[in-house]
């Protein structure tokens, strides 16, 4: 991961092979912030595991088996009651046939 600061904003590049949640949680610890808005993210992902809450309130995890284009990423970072960084992220992907 590489990052730079411009005023109060951080710009982050996540390196190939780094996991998005873990990398952003590590950034929160490195920089020392308690809360942040994630306003935008794009790029190419592979070996993607994502999850969602179904209509019965059950959290379902699924894999995207092929590399995909991350066309939108947003969310937030906050601290849990025990002080650990927690990420809540929403994403949209596109396959190589432009299906989102």
Segments the model singles out, each with a brief description of its role:
Residues 1-100:
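N-terminal intrinsically disordered, cationic/polar leader segments
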